[in-house]
């Protein structure tokens, strides 16, 4: 195949780029230097890995989770995104002026004909359960088309390949791809090591393809964790071969179940894209659905009126002082934990929104006295965390175990905070590592109105039927959140990063993409690049919007149904101030 289509015309190249043209998401830091020279890329580009030629045929998936195989598959995807899933950036330049921004399309222009990839860490083996992975990378593209990418880790290589792919656009003439801003020098590294999204698969079931597409979106935004809240009181979509009754009676349907092969496939798919997938089975609350198969293990299942016993129907919690519950959980964890442990560091044990009133249904307790229940909860948590550790995994929990129940946790346990209002500082001040998911900023399901219905005798009290956590978390609000705000240095060091949350009461396959993207990308830049720039100033929405508009277009071109954040008029305005609200 020809390297480029030779065109019989010349176009004058405008060295001054338009708003989103040449912008990257998330913005590289600490170094992103670029020029104004256009460079093409050859379709028959050669790629080397540590000096050896690297095969990169189309649609390549890694044969094994090795550094070389993962890199080869990453190259395959990056080139596919450049040559087959790219876009002509007419919407990023002033109306009908694309010809002024595209380079001259002729045979004499410089082109990237080889990409040299170097893994500098010295260890070419790949450990998906490794902690403190160095995800930094270096990328350079010269005016002559010389391209080099290096990193100490495989994940860093994948991030660099994503940046490489974002630099190129499709030419309006077709068959030609180019970047606008060589020479390019990038030194890039994340501010936070934990950058993720939590997906609830219990309120609505998401097919494997939806989850894999979400993983694609995470990788395009340099997010590296997918936290799957896999079960809840509403449904149990997880097949446990040794306890088949759980999904047989607890799933919405037998087509709404993740098999062991599905779980393995999802985790491997994620790791091949730099995304660790880890799972959570919330307990001892949020577990009512177990009562469908094992009613003697659960109290207050679907108790009414529900708001006395849980946050939403159906209620249900494990008995806190029952040997049968411990036997059941031993069998459950013996089945699931060894299967996920080779691919992940974490396992979530939940712990949120436990309602003491549930234990009034327990004939062995018949109390809601927290002084009685707290020691039992402590023992329950200790037992589950021992099982998690014995499988080689690190437990994660929700914040209420610390902030409301005063449970003593091991120093390894990671606490996920969601209630805001100084909770991160409180948790960190007690020495716990923290993942921030402040609902005021990072709950992407909020602002969609009530899913509850109200009878004629009471409906007027609840107009206009707002949900509990509105308003909608716009991309600007997501972008404004700093996980370390208000923390002292010691506390800030304990913040591992954050996760945006996608609770699925009103989200399913049909609106997942549009509600997640590109808003999750706004959090991705905060977590990768930092809320503030090198000068200590908050990153500006005004200068971020053109780049996020361009990123949204990339996502759409790559098969993700991302929502627009502005009208096209804003994108095509000659500078970023066209849709900026006047200061005074």
Which ranges hold each PLM region?
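Flexible, acidic glycine-rich loops studded with aromatic residues
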Residues: 395, 400-403, 407-413, 417-584
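Acidic, contiguous N-terminal accessory segments
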Residues: 14-193, 395-404, 409, 550-553, ...
């Amino acid at each position: 195949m020809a390297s480029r289509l030779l065109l019989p015309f010349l176009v004058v190249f405008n060295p001054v780029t338009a708003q989103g043209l040449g912008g990257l998401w998330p913005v590289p830091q600490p170094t992103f230097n670029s020029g104004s020279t256009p460079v093409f890329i050859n379709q028959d580009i050669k790629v080397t890995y540590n000096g050896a030629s690297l095969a990169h045929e189309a649609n390549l998936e890694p044969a094994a989770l090795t550094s070389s195989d993962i890199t080869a598959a990453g190259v395959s995807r990056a080139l596919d995104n450049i040559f087959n899933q790219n876009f002509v950036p007419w919407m990023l330049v002033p109306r009908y002026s694309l010809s002024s921004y595209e380079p001259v399309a002729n045979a004499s222009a410089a082109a990237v004909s080889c990409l040299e990839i170097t893994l500098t860490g010295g260890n070419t083996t790949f450990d998906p359960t490794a902690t403190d992975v160095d995800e930094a990378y270096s990328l350079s593209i010269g005016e002559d088309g010389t391209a080099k990418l290096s990193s100490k880790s495989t994940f860093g290589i994948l991030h660099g390949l994503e940046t490489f792919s974002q630099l190129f656009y499709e030419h309006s003439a077709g068959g030609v791809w180019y970047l606008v801003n060589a020479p390019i020098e990038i030194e890039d590294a994340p501010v936070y090591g934990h950058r993720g999204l939590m997906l609830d698969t219990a309120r609505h079931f998401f097919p494997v393809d939806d989850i894999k597409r979400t993983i694609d979106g995470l990788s395009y935004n340099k997010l590296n964790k997918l936290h799957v809240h896999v079960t809840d009181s509403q449904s149990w979509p997880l097949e446990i071969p040794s306890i088949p009754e759980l999904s047989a009676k607890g799933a919405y349907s037998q087509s709404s179940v993740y098999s062991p092969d599905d779980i393995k496939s999802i985790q491997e798919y994620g790791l091949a894209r730099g995304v660790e997938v880890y799972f959570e089975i919330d307990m001892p609350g949020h577990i009512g659905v177990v009562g469908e198969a094992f009613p003697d293990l659960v109290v207050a299942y679907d108790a009414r009126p529900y708001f006395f016993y849980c946050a939403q129907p159906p209620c249900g919690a494990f008995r806190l002082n029952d040997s049968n519950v411990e036997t059941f959980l031993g069998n459950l964890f013996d089945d699931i934990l060894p299967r996920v442990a080779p691919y992940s560091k974490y396992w979530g044990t939940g712990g949120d929104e436990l309602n003491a009133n549930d234990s009034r249904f327990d004939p062995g307790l018949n109390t809601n006295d927290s002084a009685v229940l707290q020691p039992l909860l402590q023992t329950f948590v200790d037992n589950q965390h021992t099982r998690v550790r014995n499988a080689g995994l690190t437990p994660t929990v929700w914040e209420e175990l610390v902030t409301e129940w005063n449970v003593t946790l091991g120093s390894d346990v990671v606490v996920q905070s969601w209630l805001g209002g100084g909770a991160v500082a409180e948790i960190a001040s007690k020495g716990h590592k923290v993942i921030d998911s402040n609902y005021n900023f990072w709950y992407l399901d909020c602002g969609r109105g009530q899913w509850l219905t109200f009878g004629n005798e009471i409906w007027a009290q609840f107009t206009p039927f707002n949900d509990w956590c509105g308003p909608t978390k716009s991309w600007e609000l997501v972008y404004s959140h700093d996980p370390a705000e208000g923390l002292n240095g010691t506390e800030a060091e304990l913040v591992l990063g954050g996760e945006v949350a996608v609770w699925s009461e009103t989200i399913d396959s049909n609106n997942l993409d549009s509600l997640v993207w590109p808003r999750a990308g706004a959090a991705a830049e905060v977590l990768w690049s930092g809320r503030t720039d090198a000068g200590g100033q908050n990153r500006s929405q005004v200068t971020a919007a053109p780049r996020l508009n361009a990123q949204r277009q990339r996502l759409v071109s790559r098969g993700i149904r991302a929502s627009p954040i502005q009208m096209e008029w804003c994108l095509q305005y000659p500078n970023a101030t066209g849709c900026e609200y006047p200061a005074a």
